[in-house]
From Swiss-Prot:
GO terms for molecular function: ribosomal small subunit binding. It is found in: Cytoplasm. This is Ribosome-binding factor A. The keyword Cytoplasm applies. The keyword Membrane does not apply. One of its GO terms (biological process) is ribosome biogenesis. GO terms for cellular component: cytosol. Its main location: cytoplasm. Monomer. Binds 30S ribosomal subunits, but not 50S ribosomal subunits or 70S ribosomes. Belongs to the RbfA family. Gene3D superfamilies: 3.30.300.20. Coiled coil: none annotated. It comes from the Bacteria.
Amino acid sequence: MAKDYSRTQRIGDQMQRELAQLIQREIKDPRLGLVTITGVEVSRDVAHAKVFITVMGQDDAGKIALNMEILNDAAGYLRMLLGKSMKLRSVPQLHFHYDESIRRGAELSALIERAVAEDGRRHGDETED
């Protein structure tokens, strides 16, 4: 059975691809790090879009906040460029959000590895007795 793939999802996917290229090519701010767009959620009325990003190699909250500020300041410019590249009647307003899921996933993975190693040590100690 085919999965429902709504118009807003298609727009979000296309916006994700377009924004990745536009940020790389058009935003000339040297303070901007290596930004990865992890997802775009478009509202049902296509008036707003939440753009989720990560900054490669940045764990410092101050540097992440600076990157977010740069992108939010450039949101109008990026929206105008999106309007030229996408065939939409109205281009959604862009709202950039930092995506915590990758960092949380890495933390959970480290916790699981630690728990498995601890369990292995305990299990190894029990079999030697």
